[in-house]
């Protein structure tokens, strides 16, 4: 087993928090970044040790979380794998993997331009590459400390009644990319505080990791697969701002003698530079298979105008869209402001809104 002792430092009475690391593998820490959009520098040592009092920031409490393992370069993490999120810093546990198609326009831009794709509205054709994501549970103790940098601490579903606009959410459920996972081990039999942890996972010290799926988890995954499934991920970088979009089909409802199709989309904004920028505006174009084209403009996103800095480089949020057609496309731009008052536009990669063609009945909420 590799690694470094993971500790969490919570600032009493504030939302700022960090983790300090002590590693057994040279002076370089196993993980260099993490936390609520980015952490302060980590402490390292050539041998495993506990941090001395002089390393502790005044007013913060250190507590042992576990021991880091070497992140997997190949293969998948198993059900029950504990981890720290490398970008948002929360503790979590893997429930099961998803095999997604990643459409990376940054990779495509390095290849010769191909014929325009009408569905992509003038953009180059991008080939999808298989990439692993995971359905995870977030430790409830950490949710308050990431709420300023991530608005996706819950997965939303259509409600199980006739109101076509009613949604409900399962808090502490998230989707995580393979490279976001910093795996660790813990001797605690209940290391993650979430109401579904013990309902979904069983402690088995003979296994590695020592948490195995209960039949409840397998049944839940099977019944809700159409409404949980992550299939496509779209990514593009403009002027060192990377935008990642993940759309999810939520189902169809009947309203006023017509069908209304719903999608949820998750967006992560990442500042890959050290310059501070602030999101000011969004500009969406929404095309429906029925032939309509809608333009949506507004200030910020989800009521916020997040600042992306070297210390907190990422922001993530979810929103929803409905169409009176079974498919469509979305694309657009985010307008950012620099400290000198100048502005620049960042492209949102175009993505498809596809419904489940095999859907026989609309979802009736989450099945247990």
UniProtKB/Swiss-Prot annotation:
Residues 1-21 form a transit peptide. GO terms for biological process: error-free translesion synthesis; mitochondrion organization; mitotic spindle assembly; negative regulation of macroautophagy; positive regulation of focal adhesion assembly; positive regulation of mitotic cell cycle; positive regulation of mitotic cytokinesis; vascular associated smooth muscle cell proliferation. It is found in: Mitochondrion matrix; Nucleus. The modification Phosphothreonine is found at residue 292. The keyword Transit peptide applies. NCBIfam families: PRK05461.1. This is Polymerase delta-interacting protein 2. The gene is Poldip2.
């Amino acid at each position: 087993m590799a690694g470094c002792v993971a500790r969490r430092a919570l600032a009493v009475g504030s939302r700022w928090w960090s983790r300090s690391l002590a590693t057994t593998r040279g002076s370089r820490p196993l993980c260099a970044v993490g936390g609520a959009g980015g952490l302060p520098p980590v402490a390292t040592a050539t041998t495993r040790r506990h941090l001395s009092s002089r390393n502790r920031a005044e007013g913060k409490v250190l507590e042992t979380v576990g021991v880091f393992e070497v992140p997997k370069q190949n293969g998948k993490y198993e059900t029950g794998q504990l981890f720290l999120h490398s970008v948002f810093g929360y503790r979590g546990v893997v429930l099961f993997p998803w095999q997604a198609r990643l459409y990376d326009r940054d990779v495509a831009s390095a290849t010769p331009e191909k014929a325009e794709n009408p569905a992509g509205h003038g953009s180059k054709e991008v080939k999808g590459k298989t990439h692993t994501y995971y359905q995870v549970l977030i430790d409830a103790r950490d949710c308050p400390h990431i709420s300023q940098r991530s608005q996706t601490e819950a997965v939303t579903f259509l409600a199980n009644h006739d109101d076509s606009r009613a949604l409900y959410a399962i808090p502490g459920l998230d989707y995580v990319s393979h490279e976001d996972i910093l795996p660790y081990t813990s001797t605690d039999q209940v290391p993650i505080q979430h109401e579904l942890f013990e309902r979904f996972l069983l402690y088995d010290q003979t296994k590695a990791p020592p948490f195995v799926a209960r039949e409840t988890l397998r049944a839940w995954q099977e019944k809700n697969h159409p409404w949980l499934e992550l299939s496509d991920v779209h990514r593009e970088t403009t002027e060192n701002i990377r935008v990642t979009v993940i759309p999810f089909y939520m189902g169809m409802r009947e309203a006023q003698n017509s069908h209304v199709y719903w999608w949820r989309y998750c967006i992560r904004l990442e500042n890959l530079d050290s310059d501070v920028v602030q999101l000011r505006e969004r500009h969406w174009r929404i095309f429906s298979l029925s032939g309509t084209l809608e333009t949506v403009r507004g200030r910020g996103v989800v009521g916020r105008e997040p600042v992306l800095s070297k210390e907190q480089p990422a922001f993530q949020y979810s929103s929803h869209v409905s169409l009176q057609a079974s498919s469509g496309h979305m694309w657009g731009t985010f307008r950012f402001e620099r400290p000198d008052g100048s502005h620049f536009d960042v492209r949102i990669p175009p993505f498809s809104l596809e419904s489940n063609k095999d859907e026989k009945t609309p979802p009736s909420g989450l099945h247990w």
